[in-house]
Amino acid sequence: MANMASVTYAIEGSQKNLEEILGAICLAMTDKKHWTEYKACEHLGFSEQELDGKWLGGEIDDNPTLDNGVLRFYAEERWGLQDFEELLRQKFPDIKVYWVVEERGNEVYCTNDKEGKYFPERYWVDTAQDDIYNSEYFSTEKEIYEWLSKITHGRVKCKEDVEKFNSDYEDSGANDENFIYIHKFEIEGEEP
């Protein structure tokens, strides 16, 4: 079974091009609820031969938005970023496609938004303390440790404290789940 990745897109371009992409996405969602990325590419005029061998198994959510020259949408894609972005750039060479990918099953956290224009968060922190679960996104390590200090009542203030926190609970044999995981978004892919 495929691990599903959450992919969020922010696309800049001319109003005409963005409306064409949005229209294709909306048509794809009315066709079927499966393979909406593939269907959107068909509606953009790609032939079956052009799509053959491409990874286009993503499902685009029901709420794409076009506002102030930016098309935004979210997709669930199998194993991570697929070929949808590449095909959009091929059809519309003047667009800029920004994305962020989270695939928690294989610990994949990445973005091509180097400057943080649309996706400024660089960390996702996942915690459990006495079976109380929390997760937050952060732009800086300083923000992470301020938040962790608050939720751990001052116990965790730095990287070494995180390691100690995790080690203490692993060594204790306690039945409750206690952990702190800090996931960093890597900068990858072609810049928009």
Where are the language model's segments positioned?
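Short, extreme N-terminal segment that most often corresponds to the first beta-strand
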Residues: 1-31, 188-192
